Amino acid sequence: MTVKNISTRAQICGRSANCHGGHSAVEQASYIGRVKMYSEYDGHTYYPKYSEDLVHSEVMLPPNAPSEFKDPTRLWNSVELSEKQSNAQLARTFRVELPNEWSYELAVEVMKDFVQRNFVDKGMCAEFAIHDSENKKNGQRNLHSHILLTLRSLDDEGHWMPKQKKVYILDENGDRIPLIDKKTGMQKVDKQNRKQWKCSTVCTNDWGNK
């Protein structure tokens, strides 16, 4: 049994008004885990509106993640504090609609496998929760899952890596290409008199392309 044909919806959680997956990773974790959580970034304590529909919640980590990240409060506060920009993207959220005829045991088993294979095995830290609520429009059962994913990679020591890195553009011989000043025809130097080379910025992971 897989979630291959089950409806999913992905959004970005971030500080920008254009992010539709929430504006605080801690708030989102509080919501899906149905627990009170304090945000060290904004000083707010987030309270879940209700918790009766919570079936299961769990944090899943890659091998290089600190064991303390098993605590969702520690994980998502670390995510928040690693981002300095006022418009930073913080996390990716998924809502997965599950078949209402599934048992809780099957739902947990399938979602753990789905999260492990698609996200954790690629290096992401993930929290998922399963809710069993009532559809307010038709009164029917609404079994579904929420997933919250990190956007930054972790290095071998368990520290957050930059989302992007600078790489030098090389010529056909594999050598760096000088950055030439059009006015002087000479290679540019910075304020420390260091030579400048053509470069570009690339993402440190390809998670945003999936």
Locate each region found by the language model.
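N-terminal nicking endonuclease/strand-transfer module with a His-rich metal-binding environment
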Residues: M1-K210
